[in-house]
Amino acid sequence: MPYVLQANRSVIEAPLASLAHHLEVGSTYEDFLAWVLALRDEVGIPHRLTEAISETVDVPAIARAAILDPSAATNPIQFKAMDYERVLRAAMSGVVDSAAI
């Protein structure tokens, strides 16, 4: 989730700052993201996707499939295949900032 948030940041930053305020976890996008990262740790979700899967991942194929997925239409930003690749590679490496579009 943090990687998708970062990729959509340009569109969702203000609403998530408001949500952070209502959740009483801060008042900025960064505060909300920090809360998500802490929650992820609390429930035991690995930081890197590669910690959760053992098989080789065909990143370009997954990115192409993501474009065709009906739920892609609900994303705040309409991603291209290269955007999905960036998000997936960020999730695999655990570097949230590298998901930025």
What function would you assign to each model-found segment?
Residues 2-101:
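Mobile late-domain/C-terminal helix-loop "cap" segments
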